[in-house]
Design a protein with these regions (language model features):
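Extreme N-terminal starter segment of soluble prokaryotic enzymes
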Residues: 1-6
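Short hydrophobic segments within beta-strands
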Residues: 8, 54, 84, 126-128
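Short polar catalytic/cofactor-binding loops
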Residues: 9-14
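N-terminal donor/sugar-recognition subdomains of glycan-related enzymes
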Residues: 15-19
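Core catalytic region of metal-dependent phosphoesterases/phosphodiesterases
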Residues: 21-116
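Binuclear metal-dependent hydrolase catalytic cores centered on His/Asp/Glu-rich metal-binding motifs
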Residues: 119-134
Length: 134
């Protein structure tokens, strides 16, 4: 039996797009807010078994609205989701990964290497968030 994994990274949600002005900035920000829903839709369309998000999902400072949008989309994926925070959204006390409530199907790796067994998929997922070398 094969395993279908959806992998993505570097969304940089809530990026200020500081090098753009006016309409281009607005367009990019609106397009960026559609990414979580597009991930959910792609997960369903492709019948994925799990999702791996490998860092910099947020650009840095984030809005709670965006975090809620992401949490809802990830929950609606209906499969295990694994997040390894990156250098822009590192795992720490002020990060969205610690401050916000995430659905039960979402596992967020901290700065230490760890793993999660998924017996129903006959696999083990290893991960670590940014800061693992600290």
């Amino acid at each position: 039996m094969g395993l279908k994994i959806l992998h993505s990274a570097d969304w940089h949600l809530d990026s200020p797009f500081a090098s753009f002005d006016g309409e281009p900035r607005s367009f990019l920000q609106q397009a960026q807010r559609r990414i979580p829903e597009r991930l959910r839709a792609l997960c369903a369309e492709e019948h994925c078994d799990l999702v791996l998000l490998a860092g910099d999902i947020f650009d840095g400072p984030y809005s709670r609205e965006t975090a809620a949008l992401l949490a809802n989309a990830l929950e609606d994926c209906g499969v295990p989701v694994f997040i390894s925070p990156g250098n822009h959204d590192f795992y720490g006390p002020e990060s969205p990964w610690v401050r916000e409530n995430w659905p039960a199907n979402v596992h967020i790796f901290s700065g230490r290497l760890s793993y999660v067994d998924l017996p129903e998929l006959d696999c083990r997922i290893y991960g670590a968030g940014y800061g693992a070398m600290d």
